[in-house]
Amino acid sequence: MPIKIDKKLPAVEILSSENIFVMDDDRADHQDIRPLNILVLNLMPQKMVTETQILRHLANTPLQLTIDFLYMSSHQSKTTRAEHMETFYKTFDEVKNRYFDGLIITGAPVEHLPFEAVDYWEEFQQVIEWSKTHVFSTLHICWGAQAGLYARYGVDKHQMTRKLSGVYSQSADSNNLLFRGFDDEFYAPHSRHTEVLKEDIVNLTNLEILSYGEDTGLSVLASRDLREVYSFGHMEYDRDTLSKEYFRDLKAGKNPHIPENYFKNDDVHETPALCWSSAAALFFNNWINYAVYQETPFDWENPENDASYFAYL
């Protein structure tokens, strides 16, 4: 099924060329079903790249979705034109009185900062608090996962001895609906300087550890009801994303390590193998289906009329 987005969004042309079905308001309004409303808090610097990556996976689900993008008004993007943000993004003030079936919080390149030093931290905390009563399920990605854990539970991140960069094998708890249809292990890209410790999750939260890797440590956590999902990897990444990050850091004189298990024979001039797209598609599909669609209240405009709303509060 399609995703419903602004037909002028740059990602539309890319997705259409990949035979991914997108529709505009006119066509969607003639379908007599309620689409799921998904909000994406895009904290990544290359907004349009991340938009396309996220939308590619959301469009793979068998349900109609209406997508809105959110940005932090307390932060000014230095890499995306203001016109793009004003046209395709909403501020928190514009959405705070609405209800959403799902929220995706992306990563952000601010790991080197304490959470409180991030210029939009106060606004981020407001979004997390608001999501507890206005969003049915939230999927946090990479820094977004670390920040969500800190905001909700006080679980802090820890500096790693070297950047974790590459494609790694992780376990999958196939007994959990998020990993239904997965093999015992799957591959996913990781790109981060910090980590969350297993003992902190065990001691400070009631979250379940659903995926763990020898190299990655914690990979995916979730609450028992799947209203909170935390993924420390980047399953949404394109084939060449880690490559672009590597050459960017190399050009900046950071002397980066070659991403592990990525380039054939560690030859940076080889085209990287893509070995995670099927797992990524299944993960996003499972999140939409099992964490959102099958549980979310039907009448978000008047949630007091839906008994399931009171069941999860």
UniProtKB/Swiss-Prot annotation:
Q: Which organism is it from?
A: Streptococcus gordonii (strain Challis / ATCC 35105 / BCRC 15272 / CH1 / DL1 / V288)
What keywords are annotated for this sequence in UniProt?
Answer: Acyltransferase, Amino-acid biosynthesis, Cytoplasm, Methionine biosynthesis, Transferase
Q: Does the keyword Cell division apply?
A: no
UniProt: substrate binding residues = K163, S191, R248
Cite the InterPro entries for this sequence.
Class_I_gatase-like (IPR029062), HST_MetA (IPR005697), MetA_family (IPR033752)
Reactions accelerated catalytically? L-homoserine + acetyl-CoA = O-acetyl-L-homoserine + CoA
Where does the chain cross the membrane?
A: none
The name this protein carries in UniProt is: Homoserine O-acetyltransferase
Which classification does the entry list for the species?
A: Bacteria, Bacillati, Bacillota, Bacilli, Lactobacillales
